[in-house]
Amino acid sequence: MKKSIRFFIVSILLSPFASAQVKDFVIEPPIKNNLHIYKTFGVFGGKEYSANSMYLVTKKGVVLFDVPWEKIQYQSLMDTIKKRHNLPVVAVFATHSHDDRAGDLSFFNNKGIKTYATAKTNEFLKKDGKATSTEIIKTGKPYRIGGEEFVVDFLGEGHTADNVVVWFPKYNVLDGGCLVKSNSATDLGYIKEANVEQWPKTINKLKAKYSKATLIIPGHDEWKGGGHVEHTLELLNKK
């Protein structure tokens, strides 16, 4: 009887931790040949949200664009990628400094994997006492790795002062990161570090510069379908 009571008490004490656990990452079917979206999950304000991140398979290895929201999933994602593609992760590019993007770069730094972030992102990471990247992103410059190409671009402030997007010219796909809201979003989400005055101007720059994009991936929630950029402007106009 005492054993049963003790088990009951322990179960009650542990229940908040169980409820705080989030779902494991999900790798979506490839959207374009070697280009993949993977979704991770995190809790903000007591509600679970999904984050859309990407990876590119090259002949030299896999390039991650942002990291899982939960650090506990870093190794598992790398193992899954290695098993699925028979290639290691060779580089990580962070689109801004938050946990669902840059996360803890020390994990990758310690494994000898090159990590990339802008000088501004590194400034924020350092200010928060977090590891900075081993390499500085040169925005607007094409990166060519193992037969694949992409460009990391800074168009202006929006969700944060350091948010960048990633353009894949071979596939006409733009990773909008948290600068772009999903067509299913009901609000702008976390805006304590946002520049809501500059954000619409930045989005209009994105529309003009990447008008050839056939797919634009928002940072969170549903990524399929279109209208993400237009919906972002609608949400900003309500602010």
From Swiss-Prot:
This is Metallo-beta-lactamase IND-1. PROSITE patterns: BETA_LACTAMASE_B_2 (PS00744). Class B beta-lactamase which confers resistance to the beta-lactam antibiotics, including penicillins, cephalosporins and carbapenems. Acts via hydrolysis of the beta-lactam ring. Has penicillin-, cephalosporin- and carbapenem-hydrolyzing activities. The gene is IND-1. GO terms for biological process: antibiotic catabolic process; response to antibiotic. The class B beta-lactamase family has a specific amino-acid numbering system known as BBL, for standard numbering of class B beta-lactamases. A multiple sequence alignment was used to derive a consensus sequence and then the consensus was numbered taking into account insertions and deletions. This allows use of identical numbers, e.g. for active site residues, despite differences in protein length. UniProt always uses natural numbering of residues, hence there appear to be differences in numbering between this entry and some papers. It comes from Chryseobacterium indologenes (Flavobacterium indologenes). It is found in: Periplasm. It catalyses: a beta-lactam + H2O = a substituted beta-amino acid. Zn(2+) 2 binds at residues 100, 178, 220. The keyword Iron does not apply. Inhibited by chelating agents such as EDTA. Not susceptible to inactivation by the beta-lactamase-blocking agent clavulanic acid. Its cofactor is Zn(2+). Belongs to the metallo-beta-lactamase superfamily. Class-B beta-lactamase family. Keywords: Antibiotic resistance, Hydrolase, Metal-binding, Periplasm, Signal, Zinc.
